[in-house]
UniProtKB/Swiss-Prot annotation:
Protein's organism: Legionella pneumophila (strain Lens)
Cross-referenced SUPFAM superfamilies: FMN-binding split barrel (SSF50475)
Free-text comment on the cofactor: Binds 1 FMN per subunit.
InterPro entries, per the entry: Pyridox_Oxase, Pyridox_Oxase_CS, Pyridox_Oxase_N, Pyridoxamine_oxidase_dimer_C, Split_barrel_FMN-bd
GO BP, one annotated term: pyridoxine biosynthetic process
Key word Flavoprotein present: yes
Enzyme Commission no: 1.4.3.5
Family designation: Belongs to the pyridoxamine 5'-phosphate oxidase family.
Protein name: Pyridoxine/pyridoxamine 5'-phosphate oxidase
Cofactor: FMN
Amino acid sequence: MSKFRSLADIRRDYGELQLSEESAENDPISQFKLWFDDVLLNEKNDPTAMVLSTVDEKGYPDSRVVLLKGLENGNFIFYTNYQSAKAMQIQKNPYAALNFYWPQMARQVRVRGRVKKISSEQSDAYFSSRPIKSQFSAIVSPQSQEILDRISLEDALNQLIEEYGQKPVVRPENWGGYMIIPDEIEFWQGRDNRLHDRIHYYRHGHEWTHRRLAP
């Protein structure tokens, strides 16, 4: 007998948390901040982790986990190499989706919107706040390109550290931040018996409107 359970039999109860139209905030950013405060208290691992989805020139979707590094003026901010695969896809198709999933609270937030680079000043400020070895890694890594092996990458990192010594590290031009300007945000609260709560916010002109969706 296989020691693995059937995938179809894997399930769990989601608990008693709920999301109603009456309790939902009028705008999704306020609702996100409310939930995120709860998440910081209850989620043990990577509460800022989010799946970023983009589309390449052939229409193929790509997804990867990145970290939320800011929520400014209602925009979701992350950082990356501007020559990475995700950056090339954003350049050709400046729209993306985010998916936050917090299993301890059975909560999910989906975001869809436009993508823009943030200012150089913002990227400089964040880059200088990173641990020094993370700064060097951003310089030495040709992200998404083929490399010979890990040892050559580590050798390049060590050489760069030796060359810089105590000098301040300057952010490379090919590294910085993006903001996702949301047009839609959906909040999902897992409920027992699979009758989940879904509240969907969408822009209506300059205002936000929300509605309940069937699970």
